[in-house]
Regions:
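N-terminal, polar/Ser/Thr-rich
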Residues: 13, 19-44, 171, 499-501
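Hydrophobic alpha-helical and helix-loop surface patches within well-folded domains
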Residues: 19, 27-28, 66, 258, ...
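Short, hydrophobic/aromatic-enriched beta-strand segments in well-ordered soluble domains
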Residues: 47-49, 66, 147-161, 211-219, ...
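A surface-exposed beta-strand-loop module
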Residues: 52, 92-172, 580-598, 607, ...
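Solvent-exposed beta-hairpin/edge-strand motifs
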Residues: 61-124, 179-180, 216, 220-221, ...
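Glycine/proline-rich low-complexity spacer/linker segments in large multi-domain proteins
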Residues: 76-89, 156-211, 608-633
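Hydrophobic helix-coil surface modules that form long, contiguous segments used
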Residues: 185-193, 201-364, 393-396
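Non-catalytic accessory/interaction domains
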Residues: 229-232, 464, 477-633
């Protein structure tokens, strides 16, 4: 037990040092008891919330999320979804197909409900103001900087018919309860102030802390979710220690007791027909002088063989075990003792230590969210591309490893981005996730353009340096809510380059990359190749020349704004490094001592990592068997 806790102690120590360095973040301890009525689909709960105001600010009010209230006719989520259904995007409408106009048609016993009946701070009742999915609490006494208070809440709710993420009784998966966003959750407060974001079905941002949750439900239900089950021997259902007797209490209901350290949310799901499988991956590994302790790890799977075959579900555990060494080598150690893949009413959708899956296909994407949503916990509303995009990047890379596929792993993401850039619908990645004009633009930006950011960073810095940046990012920013500036500054330190220009162009604008071969000619003993920048986003450029004898040369032109040169990536091909290309200049000329007549191919960006929106002008094949040489003007 001491070994298993050593990583958490290390994490908390790092968090304290983080606070002492001048930065700060709020902290919470939740203790919740909830009682579910499976006949009425209603629940009641009590919450004790210890809240640390580690900020230098005096807080005169606080805010809580009440997500279930979005699933009511006329809600902001309902109105927005129906509005998007009037917008033509390509050949269809801009619906979220899972939501569409379903909320407006919910009956009274199908809607969602979340009500805080009373709330006390340090034993005193507080004034409550409801704003649909946000509860504003006007405090009778301000919370002083660097102080702690205790909130006590009584709440009740109704589980909505499954629409999006949370809910019950999906007719396809036939899962009874997918309980995400189910409790009053305090909003995050950071250096930008409060984040009381009304829920319209998009992203999340939570406070780091510990969750102690007891769920009372009919004794034939099986539960999985966030955290470590504390009373496995009283519950059973495959959680008990092998060979030991299960001692279930008498009565119609069981209490499931979970504890989740150092997380920012808590999800659970329940169904009487779940099949539970588990796979123990490793025992705990003690800390050494050069590395922290690594906790033991067990993977769990809860599924119903309804909308997919059992064998497809059960492959998840073996595939995850096979992927884990590669994942931890490139993206950092998984820091918790368990992870649960859960067949849910919607998904995939990620939560700390767990995921909801509508089918087995999305398991890898959702698991990698444990890093970019679970461990880093960036503000997803402001930096969705740092969560969805980096998760997609990791998924693509790991999938290639699992499939032993040597082709370019990120082609789908690059195509998704290029289609967005050419659609006329693109908005900057800095757009708040809730406020993109179209769902289509949001999805392509967050997933595709975000993934391209990371692979293209490797084009700029060199892939090996980018890989070290990923590990540096994990080591420095896990459990700390990093921003885009935090990532860029860290990447600059590792690469020795200036990279703020990359963020300004790629994240803050919609300017595009387009380079072309302009012309070729001989000048004495040299062959000259002029490259032209057509797009408005400048980049360093790799130009590869192939000659009639099969030999190749790589000509590397750094960008002036980067103030550095990437390392050689392929020692088998000679590389020539040029003086930087000034971003103000539209053309640049490279040279080779080989005769023009020996050049058979000029190729801008042979690695395909440059997100060039028109690759047709990136290559020039020369056929010297024709009477007149081919030249581009």
């Amino acid at each position: 037990m001491r070994r298993a806790l050593s990583l958490l102690i290390c994490v908390l120590t790092v968090s304290n040092l983080f606070a002492q360095s001048g930065a700060w973040q709020q902290r919470v301890n939740y203790a919740m008891d909830v009682d579910m009525n499976v006949q009425t689909n209603r629940f009641t709960g009590k919450q004790r919330l210890e809240y640390w105001n580690n900020s230098p600010d005096t807080l005169r009010r606080v805010f809580f999320h009440l997500y279930f209230n979005a699933f009511r006719p006329g809600s902001m989520m309902d109105v927005r979804s129906r509005r998007q259904g009037t917008i033509q995007v390509g050949r269809g409408l801009d619906w979220d197909q899972r939501v569409k106009d379903r909320i407006v048609n919910l009956k009274p016993d199908e809607v969602g409900e979340q009500t805080v009946q009373e709330l006390k701070m340090n034993g005193r009742l507080q004034q409550l103001i409801n704003h649909e999915t946000i509860l504003e609490v006007v405090l009778d006494k301000p919370i002083a900087p660097r102080s702690k208070v205790l909130f006590e809440l009584n709440f009740e709710g109704q589980v909505p018919l499954q629409v999006r993420r949370s809910g019950r009784d999906n007719p396809t998966s036939k899962v009874r309860y997918s309980m995400s966003q189910w409790y009053p959750k305090i909003c995050e407060y950071d250096e930008d102030g409060w984040h009381p974001t009304p829920y319209v079905g998009r992203e999340f941002y939570g406070v780091w802390g510990n969750y102690d949750v007891k769920i009372k439900i009919d004794r034939n239900y099986i539960i999985g979710g966030t955290g470590y089950l504390q009373n496995a021997q009283q519950v059973g259902y495959g959680y008990e220690k092998m060979g030991q007797v299960v001692n279930r209490p008498t009565g119609d209901k069981l209490i499931w007791h979970f504890y989740a350290p150092q997380v920012h949310d808590f999800m659970w799901a329940a169904d009487p027909e779940y099949v539970h499988r588990s796979l123990h991956i490793r025992d705990s590994i003690p800390a050494t002088k050069t590395s922290p302790a690594i906790p033991e790890l067990t993977l769990h799977l809860l599924y119903k063989p309804t909308n997919d075959k059992a064998e497809n579900w059960e492959k998840i555990l073996t595939n995850a075990a096979r992927a884990l060494p590669f994942i931890e080598k490139h993206f950092g150690v998984y820091p918790y003792k368990q992870y649960t893949f859960i067949h849910g009413g919607d998904g995939g959708m990620e939560y700390p230590m767990s995921t909801l899956l509508i089918g087995p296909g999305a398991w890898l994407h959702e698991w990698m969210h444990s890093w970019y949503q679970g461990i880093f916990a960036t503000n997803e509303s402001l930096y969705a591309w740092m969560d969805e995009g980096f998760t997609t990047y990791a998924e693509d890379r790991i999938s290639a490893f699992l499939d032993a596929d040597t082709n370019f792993a990120f082609l789908g993401s690059y195509r998704g981005y290029v289609n967005l850039a050419k659609s006329g619908r693109e908005e900057p990645l800095t757009t708040h996730a809730d406020h993109f004009n179209t769902n289509a633009a949001y999805s392509a930006a967050a997933y595709s353009k975000g993934a391209v950011f990371m692979e293209q960073l490797g084009y700029i810095t060199g892939a090996a340096v980018r890989d070290q940046i990923l590990l540096d990012y994990y080591d420095k920013w896990k459990f700390k809510h990093p921003t885009a500036n935090d990532l860029i500054r860290l990447a600059e330190k590792r690469s020795g380059m200036k990279l703020d220009w990359y963020k300004e162009y790629w994240v803050n604008s919609t300017k595009t990359i387009d380079y072309a071969i302009d012309s070729l000619w001989e000048n004495g003993k040299e062959t000259m190749i002029r490259v032209k920048r057509i797009g408005l986003m400048p980049m360093p450029v790799d130009v590869q020349l192939t000659f009639a004898d099969g030999t190749k040369e790589l000509h590397y032109v750094p960008l002036d704004l980067q103030y550095g040169v990437k390392p050689i990536e392929d020692t088998a091909i000679p590389r020539k490094v040029y003086a930087p290309w000034n971003w103000t200049h539209a053309t640049y000329t490279i040279t080779t001592t080989k005769k023009l007549a020996t050049v058979t191919l000029v190729d801008i960006d042979p690695s395909q990592r440059l997100a060039d929106i028109d690759r047709k002008n990136n290559q020039l094949k020369l056929d010297w068997s024709t009477p007149t040489p081919v030249t581009v003007q």
